[in-house]
Regions:
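Short, Lys/Arg-enriched N-terminal segments with co-localized hydrophobic residues
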Residues: 1-18
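Conserved N-terminal diphosphate/IPP-binding helix and adjacent helical/loop segment
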Residues: 21
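Divalent metal-dependent catalytic cores for phosphoryl transfer on phosphate-bearing substrates
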Residues: 25-30, 48-176, 208
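Generic secondary-structure signature for well-ordered alpha-helical cores
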Residues: 33, 52, 130, 181-188
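N-terminal glycine-rich anion-binding loops that anchor highly charged ligand groups
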Residues: 39
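Charged phosphate-binding loop/patch that engages nucleotide di/tri-phosphates or the phosphate backbone
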Residues: 182-213
Length: 213
């Protein structure tokens, strides 16, 4: 069968047409549990709020947010099959910790089955779990919106919600530190991309502070 492509059928001459926000919403509604669907709508709301604040395209933020967890509820085997079918899009995902797989797979499905061609949107979907070096503002917004959406209640989330409206990079450092500490505390492997993202943003923030000081 097809690798998790149920839901959206915008096929025209074998090539899916570009998915709009309404279609994306319907697609994830059919692919996710109620709880995760509610999380997705909360992430969309937060991503649009941050996009507004930082002058980023709100529709791109909304689309990336709607699709970010679209592959979260398929099996590891199905994720592996999707990455193997599209090695050129899989970003070496199979070698990386499994929590990042669903983002990579969502981006692959969005590109290959759902007609999403916008590289910025696909990037934000793919890197929303661990981050990566060279993150765009849209990448950062979706990463942060996922961590700070309305239903999240981890210790420190309110601080992050305030910080992300003031300074995107300081918020990213706090968020990456939080995630990386959590992963390590569970004895799980840290995604190398996550460490690279943290080191790069930290260097930029330090350079900015040195300039200002």
């Amino acid at each position: 069968g097809s690798s998790g492509g149920r839901g959206f059928t915008g096929q025209t001459e074998g090539k899916a047409e570009t998915m709009n926000l309404k279609q994306a919403k319907e697609l994830v509604r059919g692919r996710l549990s109620d709880k995760r669907y509610e999380h997705t709508l909360n992430v969309r709301k937060m991503a649009v709020k941050l996009a507004k604040r930082y002058g980023v395209d709100e529709d791109k933020a909304a689309l990336a947010a709607l699709l970010h967890d679209s592959a979260k509820e398929i099996s590891k085997d199905e994720m592996r099959a999707i990455m193997r079918a599209h090695p050129e899009l899989a970003e070496g995902g199979e070698e990386r910790p499994t929590p990042v797989w669903h983002g990579i797979c969502a981006a692959i499905l969005a590109r290959t089955e759902w007609g999403v061609e916008d590289e910025a949107v696909l990037s934000a979907i793919a890197c929303h779990t661990a981050g990566k070096p060279g993150m765009s503002r849209l990448d950062k917004i979706v990463y942060l919106a996922d961590m700070s959406s309305k239903e999240r209640d981890w210790p420190g989330v309110n601080k992050l919600r305030k910080l992300e409206l003031k300074d995107l990079d300081l918020a990213m450092l706090a968020a990456l530190r939080q995630t990386n500490d959590f992963v390590l505390s569970q004895g799980k492997p840290l995604d190398p991309m996550s460490k690279a993202a943290y080191d790069e943003i930290k260097a930029e923030v330090d350079a900015r502070a040195a300039k200002a000081g």
